[in-house]
């Protein structure tokens, strides 16, 4: 049995705490809202973020980060991208031993264009960080909380750390694979939120299955183009953290990004949507970062570019769709073939 600290008491952090508790680990959750923490610790539920799920009574929750981190064997970072640096700065002052950091958020920092593993490496010094491990894949917290079969991938430059995390989480309901391609896993997980926003828009506009199928397929091509240019393995995007995560996020009402896009497609303004949802929609921030990365790496990402114009420049959603359909004709597979050929050289 290991002591595992989960930083973050949202839906995903809570669901993963449940998996770890099912595996008989000593799970300590940290959050900053006393009312929510009391709900988890005393009533064994998280009605705000994971309703209708009974949490194991063994899960402990606290607002005292020092208490949560004391003697821990691993730290699960389960806070939104925009809060990661602040939380890590606090944790860094309290960590007394070298432990692996497992991040489960999906995004890109807009100001620096860094992946989350790079942010952790900046904020936590080597003497306190055994390794950085990414956990990603098609995994709605709502279904994990109900113990429905779920499969994810863990990735790290340190294979032993990846296998350690694999063993922490693996059980009959939660299958875990390893993949050494950290860049590909992170980019796939982050950018699928952009395509999910766009998929929600097409559904909100009532365009039907044809449009969404094309959007998902061409969206995957965009993700793979940028991810490979940044150093990822193109095969990763055909796996759980690529096409797998893309499918689940673009087609499910559980997806915050899909729901956000759906409301945009129905005519709501972005500010109205975010206020109405009352939850973090990572795809909005990620769109800004991915748009900038596409310019930096000189990669064609027409869906991302169109969504950027909708979110941040006020372009109408139906005009954005029209501009995508009116693009200059091109070959479907040429760039993907070149991508694989370059990988094998």
UniProtKB/Swiss-Prot annotation:
It catalyses: sn-glycerol 3-phosphate + NAD(+) = dihydroxyacetone phosphate + NADH + H(+); sn-glycerol 3-phosphate + NADP(+) = dihydroxyacetone phosphate + NADPH + H(+). It is found in: Cytoplasm. Keywords: Cytoplasm, Lipid biosynthesis, Lipid metabolism, NAD, NADP, Nucleotide-binding, Oxidoreductase, Phospholipid biosynthesis, Phospholipid metabolism. One of its GO terms (molecular function) is NAD binding. GO terms for cellular component: cytosol. It comes from the Bacteria. InterPro entries: 6-PGluconate_DH-like_C_sf (IPR008927), 6PGD_dom2 (IPR013328), G3P_DH_NAD-dep (IPR006168), G3P_DH_NAD-dep_C (IPR006109), G3P_DH_NAD-dep_N (IPR011128), NAD(P)-bd_dom_sf (IPR036291). The active site is at residue 192. NADPH binds at residues 11-12, 32-33, 106, 141, 256, 280, 282. Pathway: Membrane lipid metabolism; glycerophospholipid metabolism. SUPFAM superfamilies: 6-phosphogluconate dehydrogenase C-terminal domain-like, NAD(P)-binding Rossmann-fold domains. This is Glycerol-3-phosphate dehydrogenase [NAD(P)+]. It comes from Bacillus pumilus (strain SAFR-032). The lineage of its organism: Bacteria, Bacillati, Bacillota, Bacilli, Bacillales. The gene is gpsA.
């Amino acid at each position: 049995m290991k002591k595992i600290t989960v930083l973050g008491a949202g839906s995903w952090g809570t669901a993963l705490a449940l998996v770890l508790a099912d595996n008989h680990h000593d799970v300590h959750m940290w959050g900053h809202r006393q009312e929510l923490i009391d709900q988890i610790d005393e009533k064994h539920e998280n009605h705000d973020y994971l309703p209708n799920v009974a949490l194991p009574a063994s899960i402990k929750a606290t607002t005292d980060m020092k208490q949560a981190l004391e003697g821990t064997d691993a730290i699960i970072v389960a806070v939104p991208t925009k809060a990661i640096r602040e939380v890590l700065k606090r944790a860094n002052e309290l960590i007394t031993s070298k432990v692996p950091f497992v991040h489960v958020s999906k995004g890109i920092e807009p100001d620096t264009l860094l992946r989350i593993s790079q942010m952790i490496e900046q904020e936590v010094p080597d003497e306190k960080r055994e390794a950085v491990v990414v956990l990603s894949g098609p995994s709605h917290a709502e279904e994990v909380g109900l113990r429905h079969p779920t499969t994810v991938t863990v990735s790290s430059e340190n294979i032993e750390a990846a296998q350690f995390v694999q063993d922490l989480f693996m059980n009959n309901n939660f299958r875990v694979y390893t993949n050494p391609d950290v860049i590909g896993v992170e980019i796939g997980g982050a950018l699928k939120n952009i395509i999910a926003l766009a998929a929600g828009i097409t559904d909100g506009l009532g365009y039907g299955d044809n449009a969404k199928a094309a959007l998902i397929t061409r969206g995957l091509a965009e993700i793979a183009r940028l991810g490979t240019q940044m150093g990822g393995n193109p095969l990763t995007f055909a796996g759980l953290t690529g096409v797998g995560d893309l499918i689940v996020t673009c087609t499910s009402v559980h997806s915050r990004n899909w729901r956000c896009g759906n409301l945009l497609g129905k005519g709501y303004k972005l500010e109205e949507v975010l206020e109405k949802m009352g939850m973090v929609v990572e795809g909005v921030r990620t769109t800004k970062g991915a748009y900038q990365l596409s310019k930096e790496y000189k990669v064609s990402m027409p869906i991302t570019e169109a969504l950027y114009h909708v979110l941040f420049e006020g372009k109408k959603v139906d005009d954005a769709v029209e501009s995508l359909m009116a693009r200059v004709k091109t070959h479907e597979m040429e760039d993907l073939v070149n991508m694989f050929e370059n990988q094998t050289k």
